[in-house]
Design a protein with these regions (language model features):
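N-terminal leader/linker segments that precede catalytic domains of diphosphate-processing enzymes
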Residues: 1-120, 124-143, 151-250
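Active-site recognition of the HExxH zinc-binding catalytic motif
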Residues: 147
């Protein structure tokens, strides 16, 4: 479920402490990782920030986090673990809209852990986003957008408005996770964005740098839901609800 959080205070704290898992669970994760790695050798088992406490009311949201690793997260995502041992992921991103009313949707590169999945620009909280035990979620968002599509959210020549606006809270029958989204209106048109990204993509290829989006899709707002529903690519579970929520706020 997508909720508007423009008028809520958000506090995200981080404790530099590993989530405790029983040996049996650790062994399952280890075997699972070996299998995932054999199918996709470029996978990297880096540190992951996981939610261990989430509280929300009408005026504020408090989130507490600890650390685990990508093997734990991926095993839980693909195979599943009991809730008490789950790696409840916290991530953030930005729904980008061009000046002529197109949403920017990224398609993950074939070398990523979820190839060809459609999503907005964003990703997981990183250690560099944490200062004195506080997660700066806007730092996560701006970093990911810069890495993925080479847009500086704080550059007034590129962006006309930026707001922390939405949160995705999983339904009762869904895998628990927390996703926070900003909305950014760009000063460039869809055609300019397409050209901008193509230049950036060539730069990444030329310098042998990581490519997160193999391609981008620019979807006219009034047709975005229909287009997404007709695309055969797998999609992040939040994507259509997020676009629907934003359209209802227009």
């Amino acid at each position: 479920m997508i909720k508007n959080i423009e008028n809520k205070k958000i506090s995200i704290t981080y404790e530099d402490k590993n989530i405790i898992l029983p040996e049996e669970i650790k062994e399952k994760i280890k075997k699972g990782w070996q299998e995932f790695k054999s199918k996709n050798p470029v996978l990297y088992n880096g540190e992951v920030t996981c939610v261990n406490k989430y509280e929300s009311n009408d005026t504020k949201i408090n989130i507490s986090c600890q650390k685990s690793n990508f093997a734990h997260y991926l095993y839980d995502e693909r195979i599943g673990l009991p809730l008490e041992y789950s790696c409840i992921n916290i991530s953030a991103g930005a729904l980008l809209e061009t000046s002529d009313g197109y949403y920017l949707i990224g398609e993950l590169d074939e070398k990523m852990s979820y190839p060809h999945v459609l999503q907005i620009s964003g990703g997981n909280v990183d250690k560099k986003d944490i200062e004195n035990g506080i997660v700066n979620i806007m730092k996560t968002i701006s970093r990911e957008v810069m890495e993925e599509v080479n847009i500086n959210l704080y550059d007034n020549s590129q962006v006309s408005s930026l707001k922390l606006k939405y949160i995705y809270e999983t339904e009762q029958n869904e895998k628990p996770k927390v996703k926070i989204f900003a909305k950014a209106n760009l000063k460039i048109t869809s055609e300019e964005m397409k050209n901008h990204y193509n230049v950036y993509l060539e730069y990444l290829k030329k310098n042998n740098l990581e490519i997160e989006f193999g391609k981008i899709h620019l979807l006219k707002k009034n047709n975005a839901i229909e287009i997404l529903e007709n695309m055969s690519n797998p999609k992040r579970e939040y994507l259509i609800p997020l676009v629907t929520a934003d359209l209802s706020n227009c």
